Amino acid sequence: QPDPSLYGYVAYAAPFKSFICDSGVSGANIITSVSGDFGTLTNGQSGMMIDYNNGRVLFPTSFGTGKLVSGSYAFKEINVYKANDTQEKIVFTNKYYLNSRFNRPITGLPPPNAFVTPAIFVSTEQTENEQWALGGLYNTKVNVALTILAETSAQLENCLSLLADSKDAYFPQLNNNVWPLNALGGLKSGYNYNDIKTQYDDPSNLFTITDIQTSKVSDSTKIDESIFVGLADLTVEKIRTIR
């Protein structure tokens, strides 16, 4: 797969992205090695690296092109991205690569670093601090917007239902240094979100989803007839000391 942003590597891509790298996902086949006429290489061996974000394997340029590379992997049913645009631009103007999960013909490899649907785009819309108690305690409220681009109506319904059921759920605030991937999309080391979540589950470190509203975008305004669009607005709160 040609990628001018790569220096010192050649890329061999799978037809689906992104690869699952979380070993805490039950039943998921986490790819850690690939095979070919060169034998079998594990991640990191002879300079080989698995780019989980882009669903591909990177080799040093000395490896060459035109080889047959195979491996067994699980890929995400829905990709998740940090949104850099407004919901309006995501829904009405942006174009995406449809990476079908439902036995439609494969039309080509997903471009490197491109947004691939089905996907959910996450953005922080507003943050507000309200006085909570004497001694410098504040209730921090964060409004989070989700834009869901699904492949089928059923997939969209399932996403919206799961989100609606997440009211009153909580999740930990993580440090930046726990991000599992390096700049090339490879694992820094093993990754299990459930284990990391347990390490940060102190009650003072938890955000709670206190409100969630979901909706669908009408067919007449969809960016593509093959994409089903939904929106979700969440309010998450955390009691904390800010001074």
State each model region's role.
Residues 97-160, 213-225:
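Short, solvent-exposed beta-alpha or beta-beta edge segments that form flexible loop/patches at the rim
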Residues 113, 125-140, 188-243:
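Short, charged interaction patches at domain edges and termini
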Residues 72, 143-149, 233-237:
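Residue-level recognition of well-ordered beta-strand positions that form the cores
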